[in-house]
Swiss-Prot record:
Free-text function comment from the UniProt entry: Receptor for different ligands such as phospholipids, cholesterol ester, lipoproteins, phosphatidylserine and apoptotic cells. Receptor for HDL, mediating selective uptake of cholesteryl ether and HDL-dependent cholesterol efflux. Also facilitates the flux of free and esterified cholesterol between the cell surface and apoB-containing lipoproteins and modified lipoproteins, although less efficiently than HDL. May be involved in the phagocytosis of apoptotic cells, via its phosphatidylserine binding activity.
Keywords assigned by UniProt, alphabetized: Cell membrane, Disulfide bond, Glycoprotein, Membrane, Receptor, Transmembrane, Transmembrane helix
Listed GO CC annotations: apical plasma membrane; basolateral plasma membrane; caveola; cell surface; cytoplasm; membrane; microvillus membrane; plasma membrane
Organism, scientific name: Rattus norvegicus
Post-translational modification: N-glycosylated.
Disulfide bond positions: 251-384
The protein's name: Scavenger receptor class B member 1
Name of the gene: Scarb1
InterPro entries in alphabetical order: CD36/SCARB1/SNMP1 (IPR005428), CD36_fam (IPR002159)
TM regions (residue ranges): 12-32, 441-461
Compartments where found: Cell membrane; Membrane, Caveola
Length: 509
């Protein structure tokens, strides 16, 4: 086989290979997006065979609860009508462990479960210990006084007598552990005995009683196996399709997810909605910006200005009233009537009147705004920091001597941050399976298409060059034949008689 023949077959082979590569690239361009979508849907639904099921069942990411207290520096002056001065103490950090138990798959494409939660103090991450003493408003005294304000004078006098007998004061000096996880107080038994409708609490009293070694109730959520459009959405909480704490149907609705995973394939127009049993309501976060977390593209969602706006600023929130200044939410209806308010830390994004009424507050968007960074393709959180503040409304109540001359004020008690970020083996698995592989497939389809196009050019160029050589050879042969004929004619003319005479004459000259 000659050299030209081998070259022809090589060019033809490369052309066939290029055609196959180009065809495969086109097929991948048409099919890969659908394949990636199917793979994502398969792995984010709540199903024992899905990649994310283990992550959903027992969160492998270390979560931390960081608590900051607002210690009252001038309690005596506050009782005399002066402005409160507070000093931030903390953080007191707890590692949070969560595990779903009693998982039951139902026939209507839902799954029911209880999520057990436990908190363990982390001394190495904390600025202090659980034995630190902190001066705070006595919630039982000052909160109870506000709750009794419209009651008959005789009841208020009975309450005052009970407070005096038990040595209760407007402000208390207790340890971090007691404030959070509860303390024995005879006044609690007194209140539950004489005012059972107003104070249906028994045993220990603490701000976070019921949050440790406990659960947030029974959740029933959609799995997304049969109906993807409802994936992760809460169907019921404790058997309820809506709560009854608020004064409008919209505010009582249980919307969104349980706050751990959301529907995949988000866009900047998507919102992040979830139901929070601790806040007794559903919340909605909005898109702020696109970011990158450890090489993974994310969307950052933050709290809009309307989250805790009052009804006059944002009419849909009217159902959460009675309201005070904008930026705080009255949660008394789900906290036994106690005048407690929820907001962002240091009254960030709230009416400035609130932070100006208390010395020592410095709202800062970098320090006090909440955010969730979500991988938009899967709806799985990569990095989150949820920050909330709990405040108590206090004032002087006529008939309750312990309230002195306290001016009406929403006084911050503490703020807390629940934070966590994906890392380690979990992050590597997530990145490889749900980010790297789709990216490889995405780029491979265009590489194959480009390579196929280049290889297809090989036989085309070879054919063009072969035709050019043939043309040059044919042209060269034709020209050579014409020159040979001309030379022969010229030689014959020289041998003729006339030509000979001419030559001799020229020689003589």
């Amino acid at each position: 086989m000659g050299v030209s023949s081998r070259a022809r077959w090589v060019a033809l082979g490369l052309g066939v290979l290029g055609l196959l590569c180009a065809a495969l690239g086109v097929i991948m361009i048409l099919m890969v997006p659908s394949l990636i979508k199917q793979q994502v849907l398969k792995n984010v639904r709540i199903d024992p065979s899905s990649l994310s099921f283990g992550m959903w069942k027992e969160i492998p990411v270390p979560f931390y609860l960081s608590v900051y207290f607002f210690e009252v520096v001038n309690p005596s002056e506050v009782l005399n009508g002066q402005k409160p001065v507070v000093r931030e103490r903390g953080p007191y950090v707890y590692r949070e462990f969560r595990q779903k138990v009693n998982i039951t798959f139902n026939d209507n494409d839902t799954v029911s479960y209880i999520e057990n939660r436990s908190l363990r103090f982390q001394p190495d991450r904390s600025q202090g210990s659980e034995s630190d003493y902190i001066v705070l408003p006595n919630i039982l005294v000052l909160g109870g006084a506000v709750m009794m304000e419209d009651k008959p004078t005789s009841l208020k006098l009975l309450m005052t007598l009970g407070l005096v007998t038990m040595g209760q004061r407007a402000f208390m000096n207790r340890t971090v552990g007691e404030i959070l996880w509860g303390y024995e107080d005879p006044f609690v038994n007194f209140l539950s005995k004489y005012f059972p409708d107003m104070f249906p609490i028994k045993g220990k009293f603490g701000l976070f009683v019921g949050m440790n070694d406990s659960s947030s109730g029974v959740f029933t959520v959609f799995t997304g196996v049969q109906n993807f459009s409802k994936i992760h959405l809460v169907d019921k909480w404790n058997g309820l399709s809506e709560v009854n704490y608020w004064h409008s149907e919209q505010c009582n609705m249980i919307n969104g997810t349980a706050g751990q995973m959301w529907a995949p394939f988000m866009t900047p127009e998507s919102s992040l909605e979830f139901f929070s049993p601790e806040a007794c309501r559903s919340m909605k976060l909005t898109y702020q910006e696109s970011r990158v977390f450890e090489g993974i593209p994310t969307y950052r969602f933050t709290a809009p200005d309307t989250l805790f706006a009052n009804g006059s600023v944002y009419p849909p929130n009217e159902g959460f009233c009675p309201c005070r200044e904008s930026g705080i939410q009255n949660v008394s209806t789900c906290r036994f009537g106690a005048p407690l308010f929820l907001s962002q830390p240091h009254f960030y994004n709230a009416d400035p009147v609130l932070s100006e009424a208390v010395l020592g507050l410095n709202p800062d968007p970098k320090e006090h705004s909440l955010f969730l960074d979500i991988h938009p393709v899967t709806g799985i959180p990569m990095n989150c920091s949820v920050k909330m503040q709990l405040s108590l409304y206090i004032k002087s109540v006529k008939g309750v001597g312990q309230t002195g001359k306290i001016e009406p004020v929403v006084l911050p008690l503490l703020w807390f941050e629940q934070s966590g970020m994906m890392g380690g083996k979990t992050l590597n698995t997530f990145y490889t399976q749900l980010v790297l592989m789709p990216q490889v497939l995405h780029y491979a389809q265009y590489v194959l298409l480009g390579l196929g196009g280049l290889l297809l050019l090989v036989p085309i160029i070879y054919q063009l060059r072969s035709q050019e050589k043939c043309f040059l050879f044919w042209s060269g042969s034709k020209k050579g034949s014409q020159d040979k004929e001309a030379m022969q004619a010229y030689s014959e003319s020289l041998m003729s008689p006339a030509a000979k005479g001419t030559v001799l004459q020229e020689a003589k000259l």
